[in-house]
Amino acid sequence: MEITEFPLSVLDMVQRTDIEEYLDYMSLYQKDGKNITNEERGKARKLAALRSFYNYYFQSERIEKNTAALVPLPKRHEKEIIRLEPNEVAILLDQVEDGTKLTKKELEYHKKTKLRDVALLTLLLGTGIRVSECVGLDINDVDFNNGGIKIRRKGGYEAIVYFGDEVETALLDYLEQREHIIPAEGHENALFLSLQSRRMAVRSVENLVKKYASRVTTLKKITPHKLRSTYGTELYKETRDIYLVADVLGHKDVNTTRKHYAALEEQRRRQAANAFHLREHSNRHSDQPDK
């Protein structure tokens, strides 16, 4: 029987449990001898399609029940934030400075790029800016008087992001070297230059981060975005201000930030459970005389 031969009345016969069992089936099933899986995100897309299908005919008064609307969307479990721990950040920056664990060939390039690499990674870790915002920086975007950089956010608007002393020192050291580099035509204003004296590309920074981070940890796949997550995590731990973190990271919707750092919120609530002591000492009555 072809699907076009089914009457619309069949839709009214479908129960909520039928759709729930369908979604459960979609978690793992076989097709052409292969196992097919769907996580919550995939099942949510399929339910959304069903909802639209049902809603169209229900709004047109061609079916009596909108059964799909009764089924809640599968709850998506956010993945744990992958980030560097504070000790790993220190090891990473130390390694960039001294070049330990680099190959002989890599060390030849390291002599030329060390100050740039230190400045770039310190900036990413110390401000949480996106890699696209980093490579888009011009020299004039850095304001040492006010300790800030002017970046171009997603959407094209400009924002000022402030940096601390470590970032300032790393940038000043690099800019002293940068003054002696003759940029390629059209790249005169670029802050970070490649060995070809051209503005660095996003892919170049991704490879740079991978090169150094792979020597620090093999259990985490560290990318420039993970350095951004590292900054956001430490800023939230320090301030406990989700709105500040959202503003600094350039999230237009604070719920985006809250979603990413939900695990830290949960950890904070668990810690709060032990913050209030019902008894000052567990043996407070032990010194009282017997009655």
Question: What positions do the PLM features span?
Answer:
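Conserved catalytic core of the tyrosine transesterase superfamily
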Residues: 1-291
